[in-house]
């Protein structure tokens, strides 16, 4: 993807990550024992170092939007979208988290609350970086 963006002069790659993706990423990193950097929220705009050139940015404008809200907007606009088949493959930990949302939500662990926690940690990380710069 990075090479394609570079070849076509594209400086921003937009990703449709939603609030559920933010929460799932937090839980996956928590399970791995990540520290502050890992538990901090995905940034809305971030460098894409895997692309092989510094100019490409990942932009995630939908991090505060639920997956169901996004789908409703697309349906109402008569637009189709593509589903990654890996999103339903139970071999992946992210899919197991998705299957467990009803149990987590019963405990008050909603995607929005988990994403809020990740955002708080992101602000804490930023404050530490600024204080030690």
At which residue positions do the language-model features occur?
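Flexible helical/loop "lid" subdomain adjacent to adenine-nucleotide binding pockets
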Residues: 6, 11-12, 18-133
């Amino acid at each position: 993807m990075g090479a394609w963006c570079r070849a076509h002069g594209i400086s921003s790659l937009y990703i449709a990550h939603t609030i559920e993706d933010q929460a799932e990423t937090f839980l996956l990193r928590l399970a791995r024992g990540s520290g502050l950097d890992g538990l901090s929220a995905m940034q809305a705009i971030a460098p894409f170092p895997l692309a092989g050139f510094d100019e490409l940015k990942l932009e995630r404008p939908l991090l505060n939007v639920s997956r169901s809200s996004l789908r409703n907007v697309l349906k109402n606009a008569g637009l189709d979208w593509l589903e990654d088949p890996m999103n339903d493959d139970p071999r992946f930990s992210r899919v197991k988290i998705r299957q467990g949302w009803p149990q987590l939500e019963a405990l008050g662990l909603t995607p929005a609350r988990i994403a809020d926690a990740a955002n708080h940690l992101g602000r804490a990380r930023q404050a530490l970086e600024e204080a030690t710069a």
